[in-house]
A protein has these predicted regions:
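Short Gly/Pro-enriched turn/cap motifs at secondary-structure boundaries
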Residues: 209-214
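ANL superfamily adenylate-forming
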Residues: 1-35, 139-154
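Conserved AMP-binding/adenylation subdomain of ANL enzymes
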Residues: 62-77, 84-150
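AMP-binding/adenylate-forming core of the ANL superfamily
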Residues: 221-232
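Gly/Ser/Thr-rich phosphate-binding loop
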Residues: 123-126, 136-206
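Short beta-strand->loop structural element characteristic of the AMP-binding/adenylate-forming
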Residues: 1, 53-55, 80, 102-109, ...
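Conserved AMP-binding A3 loop
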Residues: 39-65
Length: 232
């Protein structure tokens, strides 16, 4: 029945086998996109009005990936816990991670995040401030007789060294608290329309309570209380 419905569909539907066979005969050049081709459409959160579909080109995404200065050894474990349809996760976790040769581990549910941290033992994670605050509540509720190194092993998996965060303001209090467990929290700022990172802190250059310095390909100015950004 499903096969019949597929055959009657208004759009052409390809089976996995068909796509695999087509790929065998295709050259690399035949699937190379143009820099100005639309790569994805990301919908905004609707902070200042109705949610909008943001059309990001191949060049938009590639420029952002290249401009974000993060260093990591190939094989670095990244646990992806944010939705991939958000630009922050798509670019920072997936595209930047792949460009560094990272091993991307996909979280199946926020309910399982802490469990999966102990399973995958990530080196780097992206989180929104609410996640950081929630994890700290768990740390703060633990028995005070448990050494912090042991608690960090149990909660974070023992290898977590950096959390990149954005999307909302993070109280600097949590940056200090996570540092006690050997985890560096680095804030950044961005928006979907900017592919999305505009500024970020790095391990080599950071300031607590700051969203970091603008990326090399971004120009920022303030006008009538608004932040105006131009980039590639």
């Amino acid at each position: 029945m499903l096969q019949e419905e597929v055959e009657d569909a208004p759009a052409k539907v390809y089976g996995i086998g068909e796509l695999r066979n087509a790929g065998k005969s295709a050259s690399a050049d035949s699937v190379c996109p143009d820099a100005e081709d639309i790569a994805t459409i990301i919908f905004t959160s609707g902070t200042t009005g109705k949610s909008k579909g943001v059309m990001l080109t191949q060049n938009n995404l590639a420029s952002n990936v290249e401009a974000v200065k993060i260093t990591a050894e190939p094989g670095t474990a990244v646990l992806s816990v944010l939705p991939i349809h958000h630009a922050f996760c798509l670019v920072m976790d997936w595209l930047k991670g792949f460009s560094l040769g990272a091993t991307l581990c996909i979280n199946d549910s926020l309910l399982h995040m802490v469990r999966n941290m102990s399973i995958f033992k990530p080196d780097i994670m992206l989180m929104v401030p609410m996640m950081i605050e929630t994890i700290y509540k768990r740390l703060a509720a633990a028995d005070t007789s448990i050494p912090k190194a042991v608690l960090a092993e149990n909660v974070f998996g023992g290898k977590l060294r950096i959390i990149f965060t954005g999307g909302a303001h993070l109280d600097p209090y949590y940056i200090d608290r996570f540092a006690e467990y050997g985890v560096e929290v680095l804030e950044g700022y961005g928006m979907s329309e900017c592919s999305p990172v505009i500024s970020n802190n790095t391990s080599e250059n950071h300031k607590k309570g700051s969203i970091g310095k603008p990326l090399e390909n971004a120009e920022i100015r303030f006008e009538n209380g608004e932040i105006l950004v131009k980039g590639s």
